[in-house]
Regions:
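N-terminal auxiliary segments of SAM/dcSAM-dependent transferases
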Residues: 1-20
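Catalytic zinc-binding patch centered on the HExxH motif and its immediate surroundings
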Residues: 23-27
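The AdoMet/dcAdoMet-binding core of the Class I SAM-like
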Residues: 10-11, 29-112
Length: 112
Protein backbone atom coordinates (compact mmCIF):
# COMPACT_ATOMS: atom_id res chain seq x y z
CA UNK A 1 0.00 0.00 0.00
CA UNK A 2 1.30 3.45 -0.93
CA UNK A 3 2.33 5.88 1.78
CA UNK A 4 0.66 9.28 1.37
CA UNK A 5 2.12 12.35 3.08
CA UNK A 6 1.18 16.03 3.03
CA UNK A 7 4.01 18.56 3.36
CA UNK A 8 2.98 22.15 4.07
CA UNK A 9 5.06 25.04 2.76
CA UNK A 10 5.57 28.53 4.18
CA UNK A 11 3.02 30.03 1.76
CA UNK A 12 0.05 27.90 2.80
CA UNK A 13 0.34 25.35 0.02
CA UNK A 14 0.72 21.61 0.44
CA UNK A 15 2.78 19.14 -1.56
CA UNK A 16 1.16 15.73 -1.82
CA UNK A 17 3.79 12.99 -1.54
CA UNK A 18 3.27 9.35 -2.50
CA UNK A 19 5.95 6.91 -1.39
CA UNK A 20 8.31 9.84 -0.87
CA UNK A 21 7.79 11.34 -4.33
CA UNK A 22 6.01 14.66 -4.93
CA UNK A 23 2.76 14.11 -6.84
CA UNK A 24 1.17 17.53 -6.81
CA UNK A 25 1.04 20.87 -5.04
CA UNK A 26 -2.27 22.27 -3.78
CA UNK A 27 -3.12 25.71 -2.47
CA UNK A 28 -6.73 25.39 -1.33
CA UNK A 29 -6.92 29.16 -0.70
CA UNK A 30 -5.57 30.01 -4.17
CA UNK A 31 -6.22 27.19 -6.65
CA UNK A 32 -4.91 29.39 -9.46
CA UNK A 33 -1.43 29.21 -7.88
CA UNK A 34 0.20 26.38 -9.84
CA UNK A 35 3.67 25.30 -8.69
CA UNK A 36 4.57 22.27 -10.81
CA UNK A 37 5.71 23.23 -14.29
CA UNK A 38 3.81 20.44 -16.05
CA UNK A 39 0.54 21.65 -14.49
CA UNK A 40 1.32 25.22 -15.58
CA UNK A 41 1.76 23.94 -19.15
CA UNK A 42 -1.56 22.06 -19.08
CA UNK A 43 -3.30 25.17 -17.74
CA UNK A 44 -1.73 27.27 -20.50
CA UNK A 45 -3.01 24.85 -23.15
CA UNK A 46 -6.53 24.96 -21.69
CA UNK A 47 -6.39 28.76 -21.63
CA UNK A 48 -5.27 28.80 -25.28
CA UNK A 49 -7.92 26.42 -26.61
CA UNK A 50 -10.81 27.33 -24.32
CA UNK A 51 -10.42 30.76 -22.68
CA UNK A 52 -11.94 31.41 -19.27
CA UNK A 53 -14.51 31.97 -17.88
CA UNK A 54 -16.80 29.74 -19.96
CA UNK A 55 -17.28 26.24 -18.49
CA UNK A 56 -15.58 23.32 -20.21
CA UNK A 57 -16.08 19.58 -19.78
CA UNK A 58 -12.80 17.93 -18.76
CA UNK A 59 -11.70 14.34 -18.21
CA UNK A 60 -8.46 14.07 -16.24
CA UNK A 61 -6.35 10.91 -16.39
CA UNK A 62 -4.79 10.81 -12.93
CA UNK A 63 -5.71 13.16 -10.15
CA UNK A 64 -3.23 13.05 -7.25
CA UNK A 65 -4.01 16.24 -5.28
CA UNK A 66 -6.67 17.30 -7.80
CA UNK A 67 -4.68 20.46 -8.56
CA UNK A 68 -5.77 20.87 -12.17
CA UNK A 69 -9.45 20.12 -11.44
CA UNK A 70 -9.35 22.75 -8.68
CA UNK A 71 -7.80 25.24 -11.13
CA UNK A 72 -10.47 24.49 -13.76
CA UNK A 73 -13.19 24.98 -11.13
CA UNK A 74 -11.65 28.32 -10.06
CA UNK A 75 -11.16 29.67 -13.58
CA UNK A 76 -14.24 28.17 -15.24
CA UNK A 77 -16.92 27.73 -12.55
CA UNK A 78 -19.55 25.12 -13.31
CA UNK A 79 -17.26 22.99 -15.46
CA UNK A 80 -18.21 19.31 -15.30
CA UNK A 81 -15.09 17.25 -14.63
CA UNK A 82 -14.30 13.56 -14.30
CA UNK A 83 -11.03 12.44 -12.76
CA UNK A 84 -9.85 8.88 -13.44
CA UNK A 85 -7.59 7.99 -10.51
CA UNK A 86 -6.75 4.35 -9.71
CA UNK A 87 -5.25 5.02 -6.26
CA UNK A 88 -8.28 5.07 -3.97
CA UNK A 89 -6.09 5.47 -0.88
CA UNK A 90 -4.54 8.62 -2.32
CA UNK A 91 -7.93 10.02 -3.32
CA UNK A 92 -9.40 9.39 0.14
CA UNK A 93 -6.42 11.03 1.86
CA UNK A 94 -6.54 14.06 -0.45
CA UNK A 95 -10.26 14.53 0.07
CA UNK A 96 -9.79 14.35 3.84
CA UNK A 97 -6.74 16.62 4.10
CA UNK A 98 -7.43 19.01 1.22
CA UNK A 99 -11.21 19.29 0.80
CA UNK A 100 -12.62 20.27 -2.56
CA UNK A 101 -14.36 23.65 -2.86
CA UNK A 102 -18.09 23.96 -2.35
CA UNK A 103 -20.39 23.59 -5.34
CA UNK A 104 -17.76 21.87 -7.46
CA UNK A 105 -18.64 19.53 -10.31
CA UNK A 106 -15.56 17.31 -9.90
CA UNK A 107 -16.25 13.57 -9.85
CA UNK A 108 -13.47 11.11 -9.09
CA UNK A 109 -13.74 7.58 -10.45
CA UNK A 110 -11.47 4.71 -9.52
CA UNK A 111 -10.10 3.14 -12.67
CA UNK A 112 -8.13 -0.05 -12.12
Amino acid sequence: MAEVEFVADEHGGVTVMRDGHPQSHVDVDDPEHLVFEYVQHMAAVLDAVHPAPDPIGVTHVGGAGLTLPRWVHATRPGSPQIVLEPDETLTAAVREQLPLPRCHRIRVRSQL
